[in-house]
C-alpha cells in the first residue's frame, strides 16, 4: 500500500485559470473532467481539487508527472453517489494489479486530496 497527499491554494488555481482560461485546464484535465468542474457552483474549488488529486496519485506512485505517468493518463470523475473515482486511461503507465482510491476536500482557501494505492495481488506495484 502507498499513499500520496497534495494541497493546493485556490487563489493560485484561480489566477492561472483567469490568465490562461481553458488552455490551462486542457494541460492537466480530460474533457469530462473539465465539463464536470465547470458545471459546479464553485468551479475553481473543483478544479483545484482535481489538480490536487492528480498530484496525490503520482506521489503515491512515486513517479511524479515526468516519471512515465502523465496528467491525462488517468482522470478523476465522480461515481453515482458523488464520490471521486480514479479511472486509468493509459493502463500501460500504471503497474499491474493496482487499485487507486482518492479523497478530495476543500474550504475557502485550499483544496486537498489523498490517494491510496492498494494491490490486488501480493507484492508491490
Swiss-Prot record:
GO terms for molecular function: holo-[acyl-carrier-protein] synthase activity; magnesium ion binding. Mg(2+) binds at residues 6, 55. GO terms for biological process: fatty acid biosynthetic process. Its main location: cytoplasm. Pfam families: ACPS. Its cofactor is Mg(2+). It is found in: Cytoplasm. Its EC number is 2.7.8.7. It catalyses: apo-[ACP] + CoA = holo-[ACP] + adenosine 3',5'-bisphosphate + H(+). The keyword Oxidoreductase does not apply. GO terms for cellular component: cytoplasm. The keyword NADP does not apply. Keywords: Cytoplasm, Fatty acid biosynthesis, Fatty acid metabolism, Lipid biosynthesis, Lipid metabolism, Magnesium, Metal-binding, Transferase. HAMAP family: AcpS. Belongs to the P-Pant transferase superfamily. AcpS family. Transfers the 4'-phosphopantetheine moiety from coenzyme A to a Ser of acyl-carrier-protein. This is Holo-[acyl-carrier-protein] synthase. It comes from Chlorobium phaeovibrioides (strain DSM 265 / 1930) (Prosthecochloris vibrioformis (strain DSM 265)). The gene is acpS.
Amino acid at each position: 500500500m502507498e499513499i500520496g497527499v497534495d494541497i493546493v491554494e485556490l487563489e493560485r488555481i484561480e489566477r492561472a485559470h483567469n490568465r490562461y482560461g481553458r488552455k490551462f485546464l486542457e494541460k492537466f484535465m480530460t474533457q469530462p473532467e473539465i465539463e464536470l468542474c465547470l458545471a459546479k457552483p464553485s468551479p475553481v474549488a473543483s478544479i483545484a481539487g482535481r489538480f490536487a488529486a492528480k498530484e496525490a496519485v503520482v506521489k503515491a506512485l512515486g513517479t511524479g508527472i515526468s516519471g512515465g505517468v502523465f496528467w491525462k493518463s488517468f482522470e478523476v470523475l465522480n461515481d453515482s453517489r458523488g464520490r471521486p473515482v480514479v479511472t486509468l486511461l493509459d493502463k500501460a503507465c500504471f503497474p499491474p494489479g493496482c487499485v487507486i482510491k482518492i479523497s478530495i476536500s476543500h474550504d475557502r482557501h485550499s483544496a486537498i486530496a489523498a490517494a491510496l494505492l492498494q494491490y490486488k495481488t501480493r507484492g508491490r506495484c
